Regions:
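Contiguous, well-folded functional domains in the mature portion of proteins
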Residues: 1-141
């Protein structure tokens, strides 16, 4: 099996997925990955690929990379309940994106002020197709 490396789509502090407070993410049930704690408010594409899903609430985005990796970037925990408030999308579903391209912006202070965590899981949803998955903070620099 091929090993892969994923650069972080956000600036912040990289933490193990097991430290995310939502059990669906922490358990790995939604995919293998890592999370970014205390993120700044910009999400960039960690890969060249295509936007496969952009939630209407703009809190989560899926990307299929040019080399076959399926990623889900989910800003915060339970932030779907904000119904798009404090989020701005810079891409649409079906768009081709380049590594480093701005995807989403969000206001982490406003989200936290409304009582939501901003820790952002970054998941490989087709992780069974890969061996070791390494996450780095390189992409968000």
């Amino acid at each position: 099996m091929q090993d892969i490396r994923i650069d972080s789509p956000l600036k912040g502090r990289l933490i193990p997925l097991s430290e995310v407070t939502d059990p669906a993410f922490a358990s790995g049930a939604m995919g293998r990955g890592a999370a970014v704690a205390d993120p700044e408010g910009r999400v960039v594409s960690p890969v060249d690929g295509e936007v496969t899903v952009l939630f209407a609430t703009k809190h989560a985005i899926g990307i299929h990379s040019a080399d076959g990796v399926d990623l889900l970037i989910h800003v915060g925990v339970d932030t779907v309940k904000l119904e798009g408030k404090h989020f701005t999308s810079h891409v649409a579903q079906g768009d081709t994106v380049q590594k480093g391209q701005l995807l989403l912006e969000f206001d982490p202070d406003a989200i936290r002020a409304e009582g939501y965590e901003t820790t952002t899981p970054v998941l490989v949803t087709n992780a069974a197709d890969y061996g070791k998955i390494t996450f780095t903070l390189d992409g968000a620099e």
